[in-house]
């Protein structure tokens, strides 16, 4: 409220004392804004590889689990969530939730373990649904479009990762027997 009042004052609007309170029952709603749900944000983050959303969600998880919404809190909370899910985290060093810190370290095996859990456990539905679909959505919309790669179109669900000198693709594909297969490829 203080920030909003300051913006108004900077634009020449006179603002009285700002305080907390409850609107009377007779008050009329002027406007309402609703954000996406956390599940929708997770799905967008994965499909579009949105690092800003990833970092914001990391801060949110850090605040919720550790009462620490810092970069470090988000990273620690993320590791804690994975640990609680039975994912080995000894090969994991996180310094942010976006994946942009050059100090972050994660092994292909750890990523594969997360994807195995995503493919087999109902608790990760939003993560599975958020993975981009090859040749169709998000960061994979323009991939798997050649004759040689088209069999993967609409079948491969994956997350891309790109930093200077590093490219990664990790995801899930369902085989002819309806078994989920996971893959992780990291090149640098």
Task: Put a short name on every predicted segment.
Residues 87-188:
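C-terminal soluble interaction/assembly domains
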Residues 1-126:
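A small/polar active-site loop signature that marks catalytic segments
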């Amino acid at each position: 409220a203080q920030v909003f009042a300051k913006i108004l004052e900077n634009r020449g609007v006179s603002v009285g004392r700002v305080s907390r309170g409850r609107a009377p029952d007779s008050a009329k709603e002027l406007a309402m804004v609703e954000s996406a749900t956390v599940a929708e944000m997770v799905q967008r983050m994965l499909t579009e590889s949105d690092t800003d959303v990833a970092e914001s969600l990391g801060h949110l998880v850090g605040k919720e689990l550790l009462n620490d919404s810092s970069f470090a809190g988000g990273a620690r909370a993320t590791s804690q969530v994975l640990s609680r899910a039975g994912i080995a985290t000894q090969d994991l060093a996180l310094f942010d939730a976006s994946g942009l810190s050059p100090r972050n370290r994660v092994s292909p095996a750890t990523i594969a373990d997360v994807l195995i859990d995503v493919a087999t456990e109902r608790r990760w539905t939003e993560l599975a649904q958020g993975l981009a679909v090859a040749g169709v959505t998000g960061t994979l919309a323009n991939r798997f479009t050649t004759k040689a790669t088209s069999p993967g179109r609409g079948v491969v669900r994956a997350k891309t990762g790109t930093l200077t000198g590093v490219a990664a693709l990790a995801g899930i594909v369902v085989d002819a027997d309806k078994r989920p297969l996971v893959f992780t490829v990291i090149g640098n």
